[in-house]
Amino acid sequence: MDMPTPSNRAGCNGNTGGTMGPSDDPYGAAAMNLDCYSEIYSPSVADQLFSLLNDPAAHRMFAMWPSMGSSPCAAGTSEDMPLDAYSGLGEAVEEPSQIMSVNPTEAEKTGKSSGELGSDDGAHQGSSMVPRSVVGSSLADRMLMALSLFRESLGSGALAQVWMPVEQEGHVVLSTCEQPFLLDQVLAGYREVSRHFVFSAKEEPGLQPGLPGRVFISGVPEWTSSVLYYNRPEYLRMEHALHHEIRGSLAMPIYDPSKDSCCAVFELVTRKEKPDFSAEMDNVCNALQAVNLKATKGSSNQKFYTENQKFAFTEILDVLRAICHAHMLPLALTWVPTSNGIDGGYVVGKDGASFSQSGKTIIRIHESACYVNDGKMQGFLQACARRHLEKGQGIAGRALKSNLPFFSPDIREYSIEDYPLAHHARKFSLHAAVAIRLRSTYTGNDDYILEFFLPVSCKGSGEQQMLLNNLSSTMQRICKSLRTVYEAEVDNVNAGTAAVFRKNNESCLPTGHTESSSHGDQSITGASFEDTSLANKPGVMEPELAEQVQPSSIGHAEKKRSTAEKNISLDVLRKYFSGSLKDAAKSLGVCPTTLKRICRHHGISRWPSRKINKVNRSLKKIQTVINSVHGVDRSLQYDPATGSLVPVVSLPEKLTFPSCDGLPTPSVGKTVEENSDLKSEEGCSLPDGSQRQSCQLQISDVKKSNEDEFHIGSGNSDFYGANATAKSNSEVTQGPLCPTGAFSALHLKGTDCTNPSSSLRPSSESTRNQIVGRNSPSIQQEDLDMLDNHEAEDKDHMHPSTSGMTDSSSGSASSHPTFKQNTRSALKDAASPALTVKATYNGDTVRFKFLPSMGWYHLLEEIAKRFKLPTGAYQLKYKDDEDEWVILANDSDLQECVDVLDSIGSRIVKLQVRDLPCIVSSSGSSTCLQLAAHSS
């Protein structure tokens, strides 16, 4: 770095980050009246410049670059004193009205205007205009030559100046005093104001770097269409800029190829608002390149992407497009750490290294994976493309650092140091934004930070939270290969361990968080982003989303599928057997349909936890029956270690049955609670055909020799009932479980029955009262149905020639009305929360509240009334927890539907109403429709 030697001289110096005051001058004591620019008197430099220009107007041009006339700062005069212009040889020339343009009269004499200078032939264009001896010239010489090349494209109402690092009072500061500059005369006052300012060149406490200091420290350009978008601490010359009507501002770092760090800062200010400074940045880069300088530290090597990376970017773009359309988001960006090796190629101001000058990881947007839903935000996208972020900057950098979704209700509140794009966000009126770090199963440990900007009109905290929840839900449905990153992966990377990342490794995903961040004097607390494991929870996509998500590369779908399936082995699947299929699919980064296909490939026909959940629901029913028997004081418990029901349930020492006519009045028992911590392999059918021991209930604690022992064996069906046998002579018979689970009362066979051909059972009246006294409506109906069937069988034995359905004297006909009455009253007595029913028939949908305790038939009546259909002339299907349509044909099915809703924490049931084929039969001259039976 060219660092002038400080010396004592009253002149251009000042305080860091403020206006300059009387102190030691950083330059030598030589008397210089061209803004103390001594090199201008060097014969070699003068010869180079005259040979460069080779024109009578050269004397005029020479007066345009060094500071003009006797410096007010050096001479002790005020800013309002007229400036005298000097040529390169120290001769005074008349000051034109605008320094940047040649007087028209003079242009006629010379035959050239400022726009024609150097445009006659190729020898006066581009880098050929600069002598080859610039390599040995000082930095100031080369900047002077670069300004001469840049002046043609500058236009009017602009000031270009260079900030150089100097030492002052033990600090390294940036100063433009005595440095080359270009200006329009109308901005001469602002030039003199700038000469009085110095800015810190290092991050030191208590020192404000200002715009030049920020660019010097970060090594990347910074620009704005209007300085009004800066806060006053971010642009320390704000009051002076407004006084001189400054609007546009551009600051670029200058690198010497022989040095690794920034050696100067180029600043350009204009009186016009400019949408961007792309053209000016390109012109500055070309001018610097001609004098062996550059405005970027890295190279312009084009990056190439693998096929898997292209797949990932394609899916990300599809996801962003769908979400922006579904939720009316104006913009969504994809940030990529450069360490991925997939940055977006060379852009001015982007250094090619993976780390910034401060040593932090940097992230850049990948433009092909960004989506602009509002055309007005295209300018913000271009601003992001010109500026990288460091890890921890902005919400995208914070999401990368914290590994959790990060939300800010107003990104404009950030300071420019915390969020280098804050002034652009203020320009485009962007408010809330959320960022989440994801990875793809196709690209291993490559990180992608998706940043979503909420609509400008979405400002309330409640409205923002609702939108975040909806956004999370949408991502769960449409993401395929994308998944969140679990902490173990980040810990391994931070610890420097060289562990190979497995694409489909199990992940411990966070469930939401509240993130707080302080920036400057502001403290922004991020609201919880509900269900942050959104990236791996795909499901059935809604029709409107399916239309929006149009994969750009359908031809690669098969390859994507095989890649995901190929990496999921049986050992990996076993680790997820204890949870639901959806949770496993989320953790593995595949959709449930794909996971089902993988299971079938490994010989697994049904997801194990589905069976376990059904067993648990059946155990509730069994427990109700067991508890209804007098003297049973233990509850069923499922032991996941053995796959059996291990707790022992004992009967009283003396359990006697008075006769075949009845049983003791039972007590209403409690249902066993569902075990949520079931292990993975228990109760599962494995591919090797080995069948693990299913649930068994062992009832022991034999006290006396005549005690009865109950065993509930295993069954292969999904529902289990109880069927225990006992004999009075202590001989115990073990019976299988009732495969349908419909009859849960205990049937005891004994030798003391009056009728040896019949089973020992209680009277119908006491048993019916016992059934009605229970809590579960579905169990009531099932048990009563079975009871009526057995009663009908008994009546058939007693009256073999009489039909129980037609002969009222047989007692069967009288029992049927009793069944209906008791069932309805029992169902009404059972208190249960109301369900929200959404029934669809021929494209029409109705919605209403329904109490499950009212029963299945009442549900039919409600639906028939709303669709004006004959009751029972249609079939119902409900959507279960595996997104499958299951027939709802009786109260047992209704209870199963309620259990499924409870397991997933929902109170909304979706029904499909379908017409049933009518069976036409005739009896005599009449014709009637025989509808499908709806009883249990």
From Swiss-Prot:
Question: What's a GO cellular component annotated to this UniProt protein?
Answer: nucleus
**Biased-composition ranges for Basic and acidic residues?**
671-682
What's this protein's name? Answer: Protein NLP2
Q: Name one Pfam family in it.
A: GAF_NLP
Where is the sequence biased in composition, kind Low complexity? Answer: 754-769, 801-815
Q: What is its main location?
A: nucleus
* Biological source species: Oryza sativa subsp. japonica
Q: Which SMART domains does this entry report, sorted A to Z?
A: PB1 (SM00666)
- What's the gene? NLP2
**The PB1 domain covers which part of the protein?**
834-916
Asked if DNA-binding is a keyword of the record, the answer is yes
What does this chain do? Probable transcription factor.
Q: Where is the RWP-RK domain?
A: 550-635
Disordered, as annotated region: 99-130, 666-697, 753-782, 794-827
Q: Which residues form a coiled coil?
A: none
- Which compartment or compartments is the protein found in? Nucleus
Q: Identify the InterPro entries for this entry.
A: NLP, NLP1-9_GAF, PB1-like, PB1_dom, RWP-RK_dom
* Any one Gene Ontology molecular-function term assigned to this protein's record: DNA binding
